């Protein structure tokens, strides 16, 4: 809501509902069974934080990639799932969708970035603009590479460096 979203619907496992309602009482909530219906309702889909890395999470992510062409923001475990061996095929589908015009925004911290690019964390820290650009090019979208400084990279090679902030900005929930 602080970013201007008019209405937010959280699709999550039922056991997460109570704690989430305490933190975000104004949001709507639905179960994983309502994912397809909710994707039709949404203007933008964000996936990743709190999704986990189990098989159920991968199936949920597959549904988001395969059943929708809405703009997609991916963070946290959604990125980790793409980097894992059983997520490679899904990553390829997402790259194809990006090439076909789907809006894709990936928001990795350097650990997630290193896994997605199969590089070391020190390499990604040292070459954050280049790694951000590589990720943006790979998925034909936008990469928001988070570290002590955040770099927003576009597929075309343009990037914006946010010189404010600190390493805490790459911390979960910031």
Regions from the PLM with identified roles:
Residues 1-76, 80-105, 110-174:
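Small-residue (G/A/S/T)-rich helix-start motifs and N-terminal tracts that mark the onset
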């Amino acid at each position: 809501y602080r970013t201007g979203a008019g209405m937010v619907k959280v699709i999550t496992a039922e056991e997460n509902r109570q704690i989430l309602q305490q933190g975000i009482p104004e949001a709507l909530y639905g179960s994983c069974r309502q994912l397809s219906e909710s994707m039709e309702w949404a203007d933008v889909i964000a996936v990743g934080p709190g999704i986990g890395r189990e098989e159920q999470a991968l199936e949920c992510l597959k549904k988001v990639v395969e059943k929708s062409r809405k703009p997609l923001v991916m963070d946290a475990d959604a990125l980790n799932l793409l980097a894992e061996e059983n997520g490679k095929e899904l990553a390829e589908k997402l790259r194809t969708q990006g090439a076909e015009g789907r809006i894709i925004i990936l928001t990795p911290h350097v650990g997630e970035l290193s896994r997605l690019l199969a590089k070391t964390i020190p390499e990604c820290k040292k070459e954050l603009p280049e790694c951000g650009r590589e990720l943006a090019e790979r998925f034909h979208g936008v990469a928001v590479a988070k570290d002590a400084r955040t770099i927003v990279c576009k597929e075309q090679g343009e990037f914006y460096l946010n010189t404010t902030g600190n390493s805490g900005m790459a911390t979960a929930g910031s």
